[in-house]
Amino acid sequence: MPTKSFHRTDRVSAQVRRDLGTIVHAAVRDHGLPSVSVSDVEISRDLAHAKVFVTALQQERSAEAVKGLKEIAGQLRTQLARAMKLRHVPELHFHYDDSVDRGERIDNLLRDLDDVGPEATSSDEDAEQR
């Protein structure tokens, strides 16, 4: 019976994402930063570095949010160390996760195709066959 292997980095990533989500939520409020949420965390094999991917509720202020998080990364790491029982807490590197924006754009394009309807696409195909 095969079992799925779980690597330590996967478990630590999930825990960091949960704990950091709460910490970041409070920090953006305290520092007056645009509201963000932690969407994913990738941790290096040696657990020394963590890429923290965040999404901003206001896309136009995403650069400001990431810049602010990078400035307070040391404070966030200290709070994360208090919340987690790790000997070494990874260094935090914040990145904007644009996958939500790309997904929304694709969704809008698909919706626009639905608005065009099948009549327009069939007349286009008829014109191409001529």
Swiss-Prot record:
Please provide the Gene Ontology terms (biological process) for this protein.
maturation of SSU-rRNA
Give the keywords, sorted.
Answer: Cytoplasm, Ribosome biogenesis
Regions annotated as coiled coil:
none
Q: What is its main location?
A: cytoplasm
Q: Which GO terms describe its molecular function?
A: ribosomal small subunit binding
Q: PROSITE patterns per the record? A: RBFA
Electron transport recorded as keyword: no
Under the heading Gene3D superfamilies, the entry gives: 3.30.300.20
Q: Name one Pfam family in it.
A: RBFA
Q: Read off the InterPro entries from this record.
A: KH_dom-like_a/b, RbfA, RbfA_dom_sf, Ribosome-bd_factorA_CS
Localisation:
Cytoplasm
Q: Which GO terms describe its cellular component?
A: cytosol
Identify the stretch(es) annotated as Disordered: 111-130
Q: Tell me the HAMAP family matching this sequence.
A: RbfA
By its UniProt entry, which NCBIfam families does this protein fall under? Answer: rbfA (TIGR00082)
Reported function: One of several proteins that assist in the late maturation steps of the functional core of the 30S ribosomal subunit. Associates with free 30S ribosomal subunits (but not with 30S subunits that are part of 70S ribosomes or polysomes). Required for efficient processing of 16S rRNA. May interact with the 5'-terminal helix region of 16S rRNA.
Q: Which family does it belong to?
A: Belongs to the RbfA family.
Oligomeric and partner information:
Monomer. Binds 30S ribosomal subunits, but not 50S ribosomal subunits or 70S ribosomes.
User: What is this protein called in UniProt?
Assistant: Ribosome-binding factor A
What is the species of this protein? Answer: Xanthomonas euvesicatoria pv. vesicatoria (strain 85-10) (Xanthomonas campestris pv. vesicatoria)
Lineage runs: Bacteria, Pseudomonadati, Pseudomonadota, Gammaproteobacteria, Lysobacterales
